[in-house]
């Protein structure tokens, strides 16, 4: 399985930043609407920040669990629709003073009050879905729910401040707290049930619409987490269970001071003994939540920066990480999901080697590119294919502030490189340069699409408070407008990043151009029949662009019948343009489903072998196998059998019309039957594979057929 993402584009917008009347983004209606917007904008990816429950400081990278979801993201309107909440009680709270900022303190105080009410009205314990959910997640949910309940009982202090017996998970203490806090434990399980109950349908909806979710997981977990409390042997802790060393990084392009994250560091030697079992569980859980997993601080897998617990970043030192051994464990657990390696920072040759060996795409950030050195690896013209390119991440300046904050010398260099006329034009050209990059995938932050400055920046590394607050607004209309959507869609088409894999925008195959050339009409003025034939032309040209003679061997499937059925929608789907064509038609007041009805239904005959032969051809093309079909073109059509007055009768049944999918070739053969000679000619039909190659079905027809033998009721053999 390829680990590359393929050429595409996406938007980084945290769930927390979605519009919502309840102070923070949720998995409700606005999330689904955003998926629709991504689709219309030709995007393939929605990247989110970590979705776990946040702790003090509100950072999604410091979560109480590597497995749990953030209860803040549970949609309250959905709970209202389920009868668990009343709209008036939800609206009685003031959730925020501003639509574009999250007030985390207020959310913390009020959200759990409301969710407690929903919990009190729920009959989830009687639900088979709930029982199944608990069983499927038993490896983490019991520890997590108990951890959160005990933490709340201890005035939200972390587990190191608990009494020794429960800190060390003594069996008698565990049993006592389960009994004492049973209702609270159940509450936290209920929240996870509701989170997953809302997240999985949202992900499914995104996937159905061609959007993949890129999730972000920190390489390290928080000290204040159920993960560390329940797995102390997996971390480098002291005898008192406090961290002996903590994670961070030395001074770099993100911070001249360096960063001290405070996360405990894994005991990789211990983890290796059970083949990284905890990591496998974590990755498998993440693979259910996301289609693509971005591993933050990937370089820590090769070598990690270890800072004495009481020291500063400059006091730290590098130690060897698990490297390829952990990558192999991840690959064994990840299923069909893919990985992005966040390889930013001080990248040594060992890191570059591991990223290459893993096959994971790395990252490029344009805000690191403009130092005056044309060999800078982050400049778009130096990007390699298997990368994900960003203008900036959540840790960077907004594009507008980044450009204005550079020295005059670098601004001049930047404008020259981008061929920009002004700083504002430079921001626009930077987005074009990103899309133009050779990197397979590009991701834009929503704030940069909207032209925001640093007032909308998500995070300033090495600072506490004031981060992770920005929200997209939605009054009468979304702040992310149709104009933004149209611009992105045009960029994806222009630079071959459209959600579909073909370039429908080329002038000679653009539907509107074909209609104009063929009928001198706009799409909206064409009849359904005219649009049908225009789509035939467009589809044939698209299919022809995917014909290949690659491969030293070729399969020929010979059959008396190939019963292929209607082809228009099948070909549009296989070529990856059905949704785009549907949208173009809708914008012109037409329906793809009405156009489908114009196409005659070719006979499916009276047996199954002809249908099976057609399916074989479709499968070969979809699998990328070099193979064509050879058969007969039924000049007068097939026949169908009916019974009239207890007698069998044959009547004519339509076949493929000559002016539709059949392409006449120059290949002819003279066939001799004794003294009779007949001339045959080969006709071709494109066989499109799903997102793959185009093969051919070669059908031979006799040119000298006397069509007068066909009577209205069929052929009279008497």
Where are these regions (language model features)?
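N-terminal catalytic cores of NTP/NDP-binding nucleotidyl/phosphoryl-transfer enzymes
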Residues: 10, 14-33, 567, 603-607
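Catalytic domains of carbohydrate-active enzymes, especially glycoside hydrolases
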Residues: 4, 29-54, 288-290
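Glycine-rich, histidine-containing beta strand-loop boundary motifs that form or position
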Residues: 13-15, 47-52, 215-217, 296-297, ...
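Beta-rich nucleic-acid/ligand-interaction surfaces
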Residues: 54-57, 220-224, 348-349, 374, ...
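Alpha-amylase-like alpha-glycosidases and glucanotransferases acting on alpha-linked glucans and related
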Residues: 2-7, 14, 20, 58-193, ...
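A conserved ligand/cofactor-binding region detector
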Residues: 501-718
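Conserved, well-ordered alpha-helix/loop/beta-strand core segments that scaffold catalytic motifs
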Residues: 188, 192-221
């Amino acid at each position: 399985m390829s680990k590359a993402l393929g050429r595409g584009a996406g938007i980084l917008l945290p769930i927390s930043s979605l519009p919502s009347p309840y102070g923070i983004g949720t998995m409700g209606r606005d999330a689904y609407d955003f998926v629709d917007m991504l689709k219309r904008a030709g995007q393939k990816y929605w990247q989110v920040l970590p979705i776990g429950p946040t702790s003090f400081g509100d950072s999604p990278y410091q979560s109480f669990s590597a497995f749990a979801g953030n209860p803040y993201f549970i949609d309250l309107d959905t709970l209202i629709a389920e009868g668990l909440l009343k709209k008036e009680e939800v609206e009685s709270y003031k959730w925020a003073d501003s639509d574009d900022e999250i007030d985390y303190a207020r959310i913390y105080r009020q959200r759990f009050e409301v969710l407690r009410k929903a919990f009190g009205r729920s009959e989830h314990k009687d639900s088979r879905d709930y029982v199944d959910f608990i069983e499927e997640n038993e490896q983490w949910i019991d520890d997590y729910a108990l951890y959160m309940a005990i933490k709340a009982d201890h005035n939200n202090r972390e587990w190191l401040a608990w009494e020794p017996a429960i800190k060390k998970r003594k069996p008698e203490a565990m049993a006592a707290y389960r009994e004492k806090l049973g209702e609270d434990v159940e509450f936290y399980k209920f929240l996870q049930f509701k989170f997953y109950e809302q997240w999985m349908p949202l992900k499914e909806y995104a996937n159905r619409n061609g959007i993949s979710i890129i999730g972000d997981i920190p390489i390290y977990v928080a000290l204040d987490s159920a993960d560390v409390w329940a797995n102390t042997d997996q971390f480098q802790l002291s005898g008192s269970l406090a961290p002996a060393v903590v994670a961070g990084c030395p001074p770099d392009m993100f911070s001249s001071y360096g960063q001290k994250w405070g996360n405990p560091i894994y005991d990789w030697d211990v983890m290796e003994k059970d083949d990284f079992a905890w990591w496998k569980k974590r990755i498998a859980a993440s693979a259910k939540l996301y289609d693509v997993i971005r591993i933050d601080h990937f370089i820590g897998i090769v070598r990690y920066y270890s800072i004495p617990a009481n020291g500063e970043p400059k006091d730290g030192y590098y130690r060897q990480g698990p490297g390829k051994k952990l990558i192999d464990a991840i690959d064994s657990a990840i299923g069909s999901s893919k990985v992005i390696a966040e390889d930013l920072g001080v990248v040594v040759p060992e890191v570059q080697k591991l990223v290459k060996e893993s096959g994971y795409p790395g990252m490029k950030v344009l805000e690191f590119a403009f130092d005056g050195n044309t060999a800078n690896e982050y400049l778009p013209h130096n990007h390699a294919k298997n990368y994900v390119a960003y203008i900036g991440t959540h840790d960077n300046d907004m594009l507008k502030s980044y450009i204005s904050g550079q020295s005059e010398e670098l601004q001049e260099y930047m404008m020259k490189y981008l061929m920009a006329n002004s700083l504002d034009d430079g921001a626009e050209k930077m987005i074009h340069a990103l899309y133009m990059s050779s990197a397979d995938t590009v991701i834009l932050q929503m704030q940069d699409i909207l032209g925001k400055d640093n007032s909308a920046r998500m995070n300033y590394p090495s600072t506490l408070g004031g981060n992770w607050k920005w929200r997209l607004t939605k009054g009468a209309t979304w702040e992310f407008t149709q104009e933004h959507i149209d611009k992105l869609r045009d960029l994806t088409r222009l630079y071959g990043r459209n959600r579909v894999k073909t370039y429908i925008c080329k002038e000679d195959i653009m539907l509107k151009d074909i209609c104009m050339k063929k009928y001198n009409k706009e799409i909206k003025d064409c009849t359904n029949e005219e649009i049908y034939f225009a789509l035939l032309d467009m589809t044939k040209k698209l299919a022809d662009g995917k014909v290949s003679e690659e491969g030293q061997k070729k399969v020929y499937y010979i059959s008396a019948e190939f019963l292929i059925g209607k082809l228009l929608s099948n070909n549009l789907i296989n070529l990856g343009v059905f949704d785009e064509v549907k949208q173009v038609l809708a914008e012109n007041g037409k329906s793809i489903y009405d156009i489908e009805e114009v196409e005659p239904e070719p006979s499916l005959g009276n047996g199954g072998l002809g249908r099976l032969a057609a399916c074989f051809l479709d499968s070969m093309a979809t699998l990328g196998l070099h193979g064509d079909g050879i058969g007969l073109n039924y000049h007068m059509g097939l026949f169908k059998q009916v019974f009239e007055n207890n007698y069998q009768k044959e009547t004519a049944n339509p076949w493929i019309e000559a002016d539709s999918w059949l392409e006449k070739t120059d290949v002819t053969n003279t066939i001799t039957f004794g003294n009779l000679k007949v001339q045959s000619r080969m006709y071709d039909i494109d066989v499109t594979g799903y997102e793959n190659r185009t093969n051919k079905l070669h059908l031979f027809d006799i040119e000298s057929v006397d069509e007068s033998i066909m009577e209205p009721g069929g052929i009279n053999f008497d």
